[in-house]
């Protein structure tokens, strides 16, 4: 069985980035958005199991460039400073938005965020993905296809105009046409040997289901790739 779908914006990957992108588009336009997620957006991506801190928040007395300097030093200078700065400049705004959606951020008796060091906020973030999933469900003009795996782009005249995928449970083959495509499939943690043996082999920061498919699709389609010279490896779970 095949199914053809048309949308304004296709978001491939329904993790934190994909969900937040959909919310941002929904709040700022009337574009139709389709999220395709190979798992389920309620518990998918790097933050599927939650997180207990925000490690790049710009606390009082600090500025975005301070985070850039820290990350650059930590990576021996192998960074795109412009990308780091852009992310750092927006993180506090995103944090405020997530708190309004229901994320619990710990505060002291004066109502100020509880910080650890120069760039860390303590949060109760075990439900960060369900919170985002609920917001996406309520967002206007946003549709979600869970358990649909996108495996390649549709390219015409050197421009990506959609993608192809299949339903993991239904077996339906999808041809999706889109005016714009956002790839939010995460990294490639699943390509590498885990740092824990046996039954604990998936006890790691990043989900083993991040296979690098988004990278591969981009490379095959001729997309410009960047920052591949730097690979972060979590030395602990």
Task: Mark where each language-model region is.
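Short, well-ordered coil/turn residues at beta-beta hairpins
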Residues: 13, 178-180, 184-185
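Acidic, metal-coordinating catalytic segment for phosphate/diphosphate chemistry
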Residues: 218
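A short acidic, glycine-rich active-site loop
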Residues: 201-210
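Core beta-strand elements of the Rossmann-like FAD/NAD(P) dinucleotide-binding domain
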Residues: 3-7, 170-180
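Extended, hydrophobic alpha-helical segments in both membrane/secreted and soluble proteins
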Residues: 181, 210-214
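N-terminal Rossmann-like FAD-binding beta1-loop-alpha1 element of flavoenzymes
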Residues: 9-35
